[in-house]
Each structure stands twice: as C-alpha cells, then as structure tokens.
A protein has these predicted regions:
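Short, acidic, small-residue-rich periplasmic hinge/interaction motif at the N-terminus
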Residues: 42-44, 77-81, 91-130, 149-150, ...
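Short, acidic Ser/Thr/Gly-rich low-complexity loop/linker segments typical of extracellular
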Residues: 47-62
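N-terminal periplasmic accessory domains that precede
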Residues: 90-97, 109, 137-140, 172, ...
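Extracytoplasmic beta-strand/coil segments of soluble accessory domains associated
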Residues: 138-170
C-alpha cells in the first residue's frame, strides 16, 4: 500500500512540475556523447494524439517548443532509429536506439491541416511537414491553398506584398533563394488593415527558422531549362554570422535566357466609312542576359535593438527581341499584304538602398523605422522595317525613362487595453521621366518626340488596433492619405493634369475561431493609382494597326471591399464583393488620321464578386491533393457594350510522398471563357509536373511546365472595334535544377521597405 501511495505521489508531483513548465527544450542523442542531427520532433496532445507543433532538430540534436508541457507527448523519429514517444517535460534528453532494419528512407510525419485561421490570418506550418522537403520557397507556395499555381498570386486578391522575417521582399527571385527546410510557417493576411499601403489587398509573411551555429553558410542553385530554346540560371547566396553581427550576399545571373513564340493579331473596324480587316502573324525571338546582387548587414545590438542596411543592384545587360510578321489588309474589298521586321534592344539598371532601426523599449512599446531610396534607368531602341510591293520604309522609335523614389516609414506599436495598437507615418517623394523620340529624320508620320515627367509627394498617417476577446478577434484601422501630383509636358506644368487628393480610408474585421472552425468578415476601402507609364500622354507605336497612348488625367481608383471567409477542417470558403469607383477600363478607338486603332485607359466605375471553395485533405498518408473551384463575375457596361460574362476556373494540386525521399508534384489549372475588365479570355488549361530527390544538403528536381502547350488567346470588342490575339509560347519546357547548401543560415534583416506602393507603380 505504501508503494502504491508513493507512486501516486510521484505522478502528481511530476504532473505539477510539467504543468508549470512554460517551454520545452532538449537534445536527441544516440548515446551520451553522440547527438542525432536533424531528427523530426513532434509535439502531440496526450488525450487524442492530435498534432500541436513540429520542429527539425539542430545539427547538435537540440530542439525547443514555446509552450507548456502539460498534457503533451513528444514524438521523435529519425531515419535509421526507432521512433519514441515520451511525456513532455521542461528539459529533456532523449536517447534513440538504432532500428533493427533501416526504414528505407521513409520519414513519417503527423497528419495536420493544410491551414488554419489565427487572428484573422491563414497560417500554414511548414517546419516538420512534407512541405519542408519540397526544395525552395517557390515550390512550397505553389502547393499551398489560397495561392495560385504560379506561386505569386493570392486567389481572389492578386499579387500580395511579401515579407520574409519582417523584411519587405524587393525581388521575386528572393523566393528562389530560400530552402524549404528553413521555413517555419507561411501566413496570408487577406485583411492587412491601415498599416500597409492603400493598394495592398493581401500580405504574405514567410518566417524562417533560427539558424543553428555561426560562421559561413550558403547555397548554390543551378537550373537549366529547355523548350524551343535554352535558358540557364544560377543563384549563389552567402551568409556570415558572428554573435549579433550578420553579413549577407545574394547574387543571381541569367546568362542564356532565350524564347521563341508564334503570334497572330486580328483587327476589325471601320475607317471613314470603309470596312477594314487587318491581321498579322509570324515568329518572335527574345534573348536576354540579366544579373542581380544584394549585399547587406544586420547588427543585433542588444536583445531589444537591431539595425541594418541593404544595397541591391539589378540589371538587364542586354535584351533583344526580333519579330518577323506577314501582314494582310482588306480595305473595302481591296486586298494587300506586306512584311514587317521589328528588332528591339533594351537595357535597364535598378539601384535600391534601404536601412532600418528597430527598438523594443519594453514588452508594451516598440519602434520600427525604415528608409528606402530607389533609382531606375531604362532605355530601348526599335527598328521597324516594312517591305511593300512599291516601297520600303523604316521607323526607329527610341524610349528612355528614369525614376527616383525616396520614402520613410515610422511605426510605433503599443499595448493598449489588452490589445495591440500600431500607429505611424509614411512619406514618399517620386519622380518619373519618360522620353520618346523618332530617330530617323525621313519619318513624317503621327509619332512625335515627347518628354514628359511626373512628380508626386505623398504622406499618410494611420492607426490600427487589434484585440482578442476569447475566441473572437477584431481589428479596426483608419488611415488619412494626402497626395500631391504634378505632370509636366516638355518641361511645362500641365494645370489640367495637376491634382491633390485627400482620402480617409477605414478598415474593420471580425473573426471567430474554435478548434478547426473559423469565420471572418471584413470591410476595407483601398485606393490604387495607375502606373506612371499609364499616365504618360505620349503616343507610342505598337504595330501598323495599333498605337498606344497614356492618360495623364486618370484618377486613382477607390475600391470598397466586403469579404467573408469560412474554414472547417480541410474546407475553405472565400467570398469578396468589391465596388471600384473610377476603376481603369481598357479601351480601343479608331484613329482619325490613319486606318489604325488606339488603345488607352479611362475611368469608369463598376462592381464585381469573387467566390472560391478549397478542399485540401490528405489520403493514405502520402497523397496531399488540393482542389480550388472559383467563379468571378463583374457588372461592367461601357459605351453601350456589356462585359459581364462570368468566368469560372479550377486548380488541382497534387503532392505525392514516396520512399527514400522522392517527391512527385502534379498541378493543373484552367479557366472557362469569361470577361476580365473589357477582355474576353478564352478557355485554357495548364498542366505541370516535377519529380524530386532529396539527399541531405543536396536536392535534384526534374520538372516540366505547360505540358500540353496551352495557348494565350482572347479578344476584346468595343463600339466599332474588334481585336483578338493568339500566342503560342512553343512549350512544354523541361528544366533540371540542382541545389547544394552548407551550414545554412538565413539573414536576420528586419527592414520592411518604405514606399512599397510607389515601387510597384514604377
């Protein structure tokens, strides 16, 4: 009896100690002196073995969880060792025994939902799951619910802002330099609130795991792609960390970027009472050489203070496009044909300098300051030669553009009434200049030399408050925005294009979560300004049958958006209704001077709705499919024409996990015929697949994209004008990618990049 009570007392004391532990840490060892590196450590609920969290152990066998140990079990597995289950404790030393028979490279991880909603954000945990073995961040994103198969768009919201460890991503190539096994989690915020730019409709947060050890680390990636042409790309990343100081260098080069495509365009319109049908078809060839380098430093001054700076330079060293077309024209029953050859060469260079300072004064108050300067310069020269039966003509248009942008962003974060208050100031100044000229002196057509410049000063102050009430979470935001825009033609201020805007932009959201069931309702007002090239009034040559002109008097679009999201287990429903006041509509009209059409943009208000349903289960522990069905409907009428045909689509993603660390990905996406703005997109389907083998610090992937060579095709109809295009990109393309990493250590740079809206417009 005494032994029974003693045992019961020991259990009670052990449970009490575990309940008081607020964190769990330990090491995985083979014996007292040999650690087991990179073991899979999972935290489970003791009551039902439900998955709580997971990590990959360090090279020294260490692991940790930021949660208490009460009522939890630690599961540890590693290739070549027996899997063990132990009660969780604050400090653990776990010894693994070699398995009697190796598991042939099979790593079993707990089944978990693909996503869940936490405080209004959709969260997908990557660390310790099969997603962490897919290669690169781009490969992970392509397989996640709510993300398009191209990995760069949020379904129903478009291209998001991306933050990597709280650092604003400047170049999409950065995603190709993050190994998937370094990603802790991915969060999608579809209600960013007032603290971001006025046009931001979604924010993607990628958090990487804390690197193990110090010293020099890096990765090298080489990729070879072939379709009808060859394409060679390479990336090299180096990172040196010593205590709190962190130096990093990221580089990439695309030395042989070539492509070949076939294109056909058709135009039907009336010119001065005569019916005109014109088309051209032929081949195009592109070739480019590009490079990118980014260097930076981060200094963790104390546990609460850090600062850093980054310089990034990207350049298109050469970009040439060669097009050969056969033109056919029927004008009032008379037929003619001629040949056109267009040769275009271009270059550009971009400089970006950013710096940040972060100070967590206390647990209830912090400061983050960012500053950014960006300078861009580009030039292009085109030679267009026409060979007709009776003559030969030449056109040599050239374009030069230059821009500068300076911005700062100051954000304070305070704890107020058990909630979080973000408030601050963002300012920016932007200059964009574009020159367009015709270099051949014998030209006597419509195109004129023009030199136009845009200047804008902008500022906004914001406050964003968020708080949890049990299972409820609410967010309230308010932003005041001031914009002063000026447009200059040939150095003279255009009064009719000068304007000042003052906008008050609210945002509100309410969400509810219980276990694996979540709801969210939100309302936001967004503003979106046209790109600076869209605001340029200069006339530009596209083809013999088409010219383009900007519109300096375009107003910013103010979009009212109401969104509803719901999730239950592996099901997710997203609905979004938006009304765009002064939205930009693409239009065509017949020119007065010559038989050709002119494309331009105008402001016109209309509404739209997007609804999508996703299902992302796991079957047989090795197959992770994801289906997403969506429909988009707009109510757009302009100039007597209706553009309201709904468009529906489907995405089907598949990830299959095989023994010996082999992975197969098969993704398909397609859409039915329907309107997007004034453009009627035709039905299409795109299928891609890959097979990958992982080997410690090395992985190899063989992939094929656009297996059935889906064509780009569609048309637009206006009053008296019909245009269509068809593009064959000569695919599928086959690629081989090899990646090697050593002592991986991702940078801790925490800058968020001020002026993200202006960088997008430029």
């Amino acid at each position: 009896m005494r032994n029974r009570y003693s045992g019961l007392l020991a259990i009670v004391l052990t449970s009490s100690i575990c309940a008081n532990a607020q964190s769990i840490d330990g090491k995985v060892m083979e014996n007292d002196s040999i650690p087991v590196p990179y073991a899979t450590v999972s935290l489970l609920q003791a009551s039902d073995s439900a998955y709580v969290a997971g990590v990959i152990g360090g090279e020294d066998g260490s692991f940790s969880f930021d949660t208490n140990s009460s009522g939890k079990i630690v599961k540890v597995s590693c290739i070549g060792y027996k899997t063990v289950f132990l009660p969780a404790a604050a400090h653990m030393t776990i010894h693994l025994l070699p398995s009697e028979q190796a598991l042939q490279g099979v790593t079993v991880t707990a089944s978990r939902p693909s996503f869940k909603m936490e405080q209004g954000q959709f969260v997908t945990h990557i660390q310790g799951t099969v997603f962490s073995q897919l290669g690169l961040a781009t490969d992970v994103l392509q397989q996640l619910p709510l993300i398009d198969t191209d990995g760069i768009k949020v379904l129903g919201r478009g291209v998001p802002l991306v933050y990597i460890n709280n650092k604003r991503m400047r170049n999409w190539n950065e995603l190709t330099r993050i190994p998937s096994n370094m990603i802790k989690d991915v969060k999608i915020d579809m209600n960013p609130g007032a603290k971001y730019g006025s046009s931001v409709r979604a924010v993607l947060y990628i958090t990487t795991i804390k690197p193990v050890g110090e010293g020099l680390g890096g990765s090298l990636i080489l990729s070879e792609n072939v379709s009808s042409c060859w394409n060679t790309t390479g990336w090299l990343d180096l990172n040196y960390r010593r205590r709190g100081l962190d130096f990093f260098v990221n580089t990439s080069a695309n030395t042989f970027s070539n492509s070949h495509y076939k294109r056909q365009d058709v135009y039907d319109f009336q010119y001065k009472g005569q019916d005109i049908h014109a088309d051209y078809s032929g081949d195009g060839y592109n070739s480019a050489k590009t490079g990118f380098v980014s260097v930076g430093v981060n200094d963790q001054l104390t546990d609460r203070q850090s600062l850093g700076a980054t310089y990034t330079f990207s350049r298109v060293f050469s970009n040439s496009a060669d097009q050969n077309y056969r033109n056919h024209v029927w004008q009032n029953g008379a037929f003619s044909e001629f040949d056109t050859r267009s040769t275009q060469s271009s270059q550009n260079g971009n400089h970006n300098v950013s710096a940040y300072y972060e100070n967590k004064f206390s647990d209830k108050f912090s400061l983050n300051v960012d500053a950014t300067y960006a300078h861009n310069r580009a030039n292009s020269r085109q030679i267009v030669v026409e060979n007709r039966m009776d003559n030969r003509s030449m056109l040599v248009p050239a374009t030069k553009s230059e821009s500068d942008m300076v911005a700062q962003r100051t954000v304070f974060t305070s704890t107020v009434a058990n909630g979080k208050l973000d408030y601050g100031l963002v300012t920016s100044w932007t200059r964009f200049q574009q020159q367009y000229c015709i270099e051949n002196e014998d030209y006597s057509g419509l195109l004129k030399t023009n030199d136009n410049e845009s200047k804008q000063s902008a500022a906004h102050v914001f406050a964003n408050y968020s708080r949890s009430f049990g299972r409820w979470f609410t967010q309230l935001g308010l932003k005041y925005e001031y914009i002063d825009y000026k447009y200059y033609a040939a150095g003279k201020l255009r009064d009719e294009s000068k304007r000042t805007f003052r906008n008050l932009l609210p945002s509100v959201s309410l969400s509810y979560s219980q276990d694996r069931f979540s709801l969210m309702l939100s309302y936001n007002i967004y503003t979106n300004s046209s790109s600076y090239s869209q605001l340029d009034d200069g006339l530009q040559y596209i083809s013999d049958f088409r010219y383009n002109k900007g519109n300096s008097q375009l107003q910013p679009t103010k979009k009212h958006s109401v969104a509803f999201n719901a999730s239950y287990r592996d099901l997710l429903l997203i609905c979004n209704y938006s009304y765009g006041k002064d939205a930009v509509v693409s239009c065509f009209d017949v020119m007065d001077e010559i038989p050709a059409v002119l494309s331009y943009g105008v402001n016109h208000s209309f509404s739209s709705v997007y609804t999508g349903l996703s299902y992302s289960p796991t079957f047989f522990k090795i197959w992770r499919p994801s289906w997403h069905v969506w429909i988009h409907k707009q109510w757009l009428s302009y100039n007597g024409m209706e553009y309201g045909r709904p468009q529906a689509g489907l995405q089907w993603k598949n990830l299959v996990v095989l023994p010996r660390q082999w992975y197969i990905v098969l993704n398909a996406s397609g859409n039915l015929k329907g309107h997007s703005n004034t453009y009627m997109a035709q039905s299409s389907i795109n299928v891609g697949m890959s097979i990958q083998k992982n080997m410690k610090n090395l992985w190899v992937k063989l992939a094929a994209s656009n297996l059935f060579n889906a064509k780009e095709k569609g048309y637009s109809e206006y009053n008296g004008v019909y245009t269509s295009h068809w593009v064959d990109n000569r695919q599928p393309s086959i690629s081989l990618t090899i990646s090697y990493s050593f002592n991986p250590a991702k940078s801790k740079y925490k800058g968020k990049t001020a002026g993200e809206d202006e960088l997008r417009r430029l």
